[in-house]
Structures are given as C-alpha cells and as structure tokens.
A protein has these predicted regions:
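N-terminal intrinsically disordered, cationic/polar leader segments
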Residues: 1-26, 35-97
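DNA-recognition element of transcription regulators
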Residues: 29
Length: 97
C-alpha cells in the first residue's frame, strides 16, 4: 500500500503499491510519475524553494509559504493521488491533515 499524507507544509509518500511485481507495477509507476512531476514542475515553473527528499519507498516534500502557482501544482498533485486512490483503493491511500 502506498500512503500519501498531506499536511500543511509537507507531503509524505510511503510504501509500495503491491499491485504487480517489481518493474511491472503500474500503480507504483503512476504515483512515482506524479511525485517526480510535482518536483520538476515546481522547479521549472515557479521561483519557490521546496524540499524534496527521496529514499527507497519514501518521498518527503516540504514547503513553507508558496506562491499561487506552486499551490496550484501541489493541489493538482493531490487531485492525481485522489484519482489513484479511487481507482486503486487497495493500493493507494490519501490522508489529509
């Protein structure tokens, strides 16, 4: 199960989807693409400084006050994760605090 936790100044992505074997897991791939796209979009399209920390099975995205553009990108990431959790409820879980 991949758990995505959205807090005021942090998003944590943890775990493995377990949808298919390693290298063939489309759910894991989709969440990874959403996460990497968020990082690159904020870096390329805004002047905001956002922290990204990656480790095997975990990504932590930390931010303070961000521009409207970065907030929109973060909100778009959350929409993508919500869609994944609706389509694959046994593999992706979103929690908002």
């Amino acid at each position: 199960m991949i758990t995505v936790t959205k807090e005021k100044n942090c998003i944590t992505v943890k775990g493995h989807a377990g949808y298919d074997e390693y290298g063939r897991d489309i759910v894991c791939s989709a969440v990874s693409v959403l996460t990497y796209n968020l990082q690159e979009s904020i870096n390329r399209l805004t002047d905001d400084t956002v922290g990204f920390c990656y480790a095997p099975g975990e990504a932590v995205i930390s931010f303070g006050d961000v521009s409207a553009a970065a907030k929109l990108l973060i909100d778009s990431f959350i929409v993508g994760i919500e869609m994944m959790s609706f389509s694959y409820p046994g593999n992706v879980e979103l929690t908002k605090h």
